[in-house]
Amino acid sequence: MIPGELFTDGPEHVLNPGRRAHTLAVVNASDRPIQVGSHYHFAETNGALGFDRAAAKGMRLNIASGSAVRLEPGQQRTVELVDYAGDRIVYGFRGLTQGAL
């Protein structure tokens, strides 16, 4: 096994099937790399990341659980976000939501 390798039951595994997805352009305006984990409320990420935060409310990265996206200083990239599932209640992170989405 290779570290980080995923074993699936078929040739292709679809992450988060049936959830609303949204694509956003994100730019790192800081002088340091910024990494965002798979389940972090994307609207509450580091303030040095430039993107439409209102469009990202209630969403997280559409990547495998436990993985992350890293943006180097000045880097712009496109990310795909998906809605949080379950009760859609968010606490913590940067403290901007603190309750129901």
Swiss-Prot record:
<comment type="pathway">
    <text>Nitrogen metabolism; urea degradation; CO(2) and NH(3) from urea (urease route): step 1/1.</text>
</comment>
<protein>
    <recommendedName>
        <fullName>Urease subunit beta</fullName>
        <ecNumber>3.5.1.5</ecNumber>
    </recommendedName>
</protein>
<dbReference type="InterPro" id="IPR036461">
    <property type="entry name" value="Urease_betasu_sf"/>
</dbReference>
<comment type="subunit">
    <text>Heterotrimer of UreA (gamma), UreB (beta) and UreC (alpha) subunits. Three heterotrimers associate to form the active enzyme.</text>
</comment>
<keyword id="KW-0963">Cytoplasm</keyword>
<dbReference type="GO" id="GO:0043419">
    <property type="term" value="P:urea catabolic process"/>
</dbReference>
<comment type="similarity">
    <text>Belongs to the urease beta subunit family.</text>
</comment>
<dbReference type="InterPro" id="IPR050069">
    <property type="entry name" value="Urease_subunit"/>
</dbReference>
<dbReference type="InterPro" id="IPR002019">
    <property type="entry name" value="Urease_beta-like"/>
</dbReference>
<dbReference type="GO" id="GO:0035550">
    <property type="term" value="C:urease complex"/>
</dbReference>
<dbReference type="GO" id="GO:0009039">
    <property type="term" value="F:urease activity"/>
</dbReference>
<dbReference type="Pfam" id="PF00699">
    <property type="entry name" value="Urease_beta"/>
</dbReference>
<keyword id="KW-0378">Hydrolase</keyword>
